[in-house]
Amino acid sequence: MKILVAEDNADCRDLYSIWLGDEHTVQLVPDGTAALEALDPTVDLLFLDRDMPGHTGTEVADSVAELPHDPYVVMVSSMVPDFDIVEMPIDRYVQKPVDQRTLESVIEQCQAQEEYRSALDDFFALTSKLASIEAEKSAERLAESEEYERLKDRVAVKRAEVDSALTPDQVDWSLAFKTCPEPGERGVENPNA
């Protein structure tokens, strides 16, 4: 996975490189302007510091949303998330300080999401073909067709892939949702109270 990290703190940039560089191609840039210059279709994931000189992380995320390619955008910030993140074109929001395990978990989540997206696209294409054939061919013709049987088998296999991509074993979902409070915590009403 190619990861672009836009972070104005040099020490933080070094940590990203140390933590992620062995497993991924990591490109480090010191600000939002450099991030926009470095961003190309080969970038799979973009870690953005929210408060950077030049273009802020929010401005970079807005610009990325206008691009034809669609890298995952993860905002990493010391700012407590507020309601303004609802409208931000980001895939994740991670509050600093971050550690290696959190970053790796975010990457795993994005990879799992990409696998699911790809499997789902293939599944829809196959089921569309199946529906088109079934709408035009008689039951008799369908029963005689080896291609139709192979297509049905491919649909079944792809359906299983989609189902397995929904619940990948390798993703630590407790980290994915660690910011989701339990009822009664941080102002969340308990519906059972």
Q: Which role does the model predict for each range below?
A:
Residues H69-P81, V94:
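A short, hydrophobic beta-strand element within the central beta-sheet of small alpha/beta folds
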Residues L46-R50:
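Active-site residues of response regulator receiver
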Residues L103-L120:
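Receiver (REC) domain switch/output surface
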Residues Y116-A193:
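C-terminal output/effector regions of signal-responsive regulators
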Residues A10-Q27, D31:
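Two-component/phosphorelay signaling modules centered on CheY-like receiver
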Residues P53-G54, L67:
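The feature encodes the CheY-like receiver
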Residues E7:
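Conserved acidic carboxylate
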Residues L28-E37, G57-E59:
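Helix N-cap/capping motif at the beta->alpha junctions
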